[in-house]
């Protein structure tokens, strides 16, 4: 896995597209501090483009929901066991688990017990549900890196070393994105409605959300015959899956433009975004675009999750703003008709768009820190002290 003698060995696991982005930024910042550094573990395309050696494809870990995870559990446990054994043998200087707590915390606990310093980057949503996880996380890791300002006090109260680093997207995305320039860059006409559809980064999410989003696009197209639809997809696997679903659901006739990556470009260029709940909702908020949040889980998973959620909303922008800034249509409410109606409302209601933009700008300013540099310093300190 690690090949260069004398280099600082950093092991990482990033379980999905959002973690791939965070880890890629962190790799850049670590290299700015140390040129003699090598990265390996499990990561995505952005990490691999920076020289990361991934033991298995990142998509293997991108599974959501209780019932869905159960189907993949034997393979996930096998991957984690193999990786733990390999890392205990190769002895990296530090391990960084980027998000993916269900996979990473067990791995981190085993590595920490074996004397390898561990850092967990991105706190699980302990402020929303299962707050008892703070103690479990503290036992598994030497340090936690938090993206949101309400998180560090929860860890400090439990005696867990923690650093608030802000969110890297807040530094990467301009405070005032230029929609017209982005449309020119993408070759899109200025005078037509452009809607971005973001069905998710996990293959299991696409299976649930793509059929609904395609029907939503059909309804919007009836209202706006000149409309264009952008669909950014994070990996080759999800690109192929989406292409197959276009055939399966007889949607090849829709004016859909698929983008490999380039999610921010699609967001900025759009009038309204339809997005599956997750980290992408924060990215849309930082681009100041109006959005509708949707999500659909299996009935079993939804019942289990609903009992444990402590907040009235699930979308990150609403959680961070402390109110329903963005409409959320979940489960039985996630119908093409209702989604299309909300998107049409946001497209035509300038006051609603202005309210969202104001809230998103305030959120952007609060999250804008030198995230990757702060995270890199904390990681190097953990590696040095342990």
From Swiss-Prot:
Pathway(s): Bacterial outer membrane biogenesis; LPS lipid A biosynthesis
Q: Write out the GO biological process terms.
A: lipid A biosynthetic process
GO-annotated cellular components: membrane
Report which reactions are catalysed by this protein. Answer: a lipid X + a UDP-2-N,3-O-bis[(3R)-3-hydroxyacyl]-alpha-D-glucosamine = a lipid A disaccharide + UDP + H(+)
Q: Which GO MF terms are attached to this record? A: lipid-A-disaccharide synthase activity; phospholipid binding
EC number(s) reported in the record: 2.4.1.182
Tell me which domain of life the UniProt entry assigns to the organism this sequence originates from: Bacteria
InterPro entries associated with the record? Glyco_trans_19
Query: Keywords for this entry?
Result: Glycosyltransferase, Lipid A biosynthesis, Lipid biosynthesis, Lipid metabolism, Transferase
Enzyme class per UniProt: transferase
| Presence of the UniProt keyword Zinc in the record | no
HAMAP family assigned:
LpxB
Name the family the entry cites.
Belongs to the LpxB family.
User: Per its UniProt record, what NCBIfam families does this chain match?
Assistant: lpxB
The UniProt function text for this chain reads: Condensation of UDP-2,3-diacylglucosamine and 2,3-diacylglucosamine-1-phosphate to form lipid A disaccharide, a precursor of lipid A, a phosphorylated glycolipid that anchors the lipopolysaccharide to the outer membrane of the cell.
Please report the name of this protein according to its UniProt entry.
Lipid-A-disaccharide synthase
- Recorded source organism is Chromobacterium violaceum (strain ATCC 12472 / DSM 30191 / JCM 1249 / CCUG 213 / NBRC 12614 / NCIMB 9131 / NCTC 9757 / MK)
